[in-house]
Curated annotation (Swiss-Prot):
GO terms for cellular component: mitochondrion; nucleus; plasmodesma. It is an enzyme of class 5 (isomerase). It comes from Arabidopsis thaliana. It holds the Pfam family IF-2B. Belongs to the eIF-2B alpha/beta/delta subunits family. MtnA subfamily. This is Methylthioribose-1-phosphate isomerase. It comes from the Eukaryota. The modification N-acetylserine is found at residue 2. Transmembrane segments: none annotated.
Amino acid sequence: MSGEGDTTLKAICYKPGSLQLLDQRKLPLETIYLEIRDASDGWSAIQEMVVRGAPAIAIAAALSLAVEVFNFHGFDGSASDAVAFLENKLDYLVSSRPTAVNLADAALKLKHVIAKALATATEAKSIFKAYIEASEDMLEDDVVSNKAIGNFGLSLLRQQAKNPDKLSVLTHCNTGSLATAGYGTALGVIRALHTQGILERAYCTETRPFNQGSRLTAFELVHEKIPATLIADSAAAALMKDGRVDGVIVGADRVASNGDTANKIGTYSLALCAKHHGIPFYVAAPLTSVDLSLSSGKEIVIEERSPKELMHTHGGLGERIAAPGISVWNPAFDMTPAELIAGIITEKGVITKNGNDTFDISSFAKKITGNSSR
């Protein structure tokens, strides 16, 4: 399916029994949607970077399995067999991108849904129905969550800015509609600033080696007619020294309970530069990106990707540019310590520090849970 002629930026196009993912490897030159028929297609699309961005990965994985079971014809097993089938498929999908906690979190929540359904189900189709409905809810909930992040981020940046009516911000990688179900996290905050008429300029890094900034974020910013400038990754420090930005805002693939954050490679460098220049550095992410089982970022598994992404143009898809025989180290993410982060913007509010260098996200989560249960 081709997306040509459709001006709406959507990474995920879904209806019951059908899923297409925008092939982000082709952007911004081609807009092509790939048909995803089952969990195997979903795994490959995630692993091969057809779809990327922690929230979008989780939703695409869940829906790929939803499409598979929707189109089942004559599953012979029992309700218990259906649960076992889904659990095995979810474990398989989680292996596609181990650093992004949203994917593992979504799988765990879906396992809870089908386990609960098993208590009353008499046949497999009841289990599959419960799974499909829960997956579809995740798609809808992500957009609502992103808009809340945008609004909280808007308020925070205005409160802490020297001139709250004119703000310029720097972002890294891609955290917009293409990385989520819609609207975006860090880019959603930028979108909210623009909507309110107080964004002077958004700066985005190219984000090598896969160029998510130059290919995807720049594409979204131009599409939304947001005033924006693309910079080389290595120009960020000079940009800050010149006083061109009021804040740096990035997304997250996994946040430990103390606030240490794993995000696209280069994030740590930006945080260090921001600290040196006295510029606030923010993380914008849904609470599904937080892994409370991890006490610090030292426990986060950092994915390493193919050397080809550095040795060839276009993130490994183009012609060779590196000298034959050179060794390559290509981590996809790095870990930014909490001490460099000014605040973590979530859909439930902004997490701040309690007078030390780290965050107490567990207490924040408990407070939110307590308030929502009243």
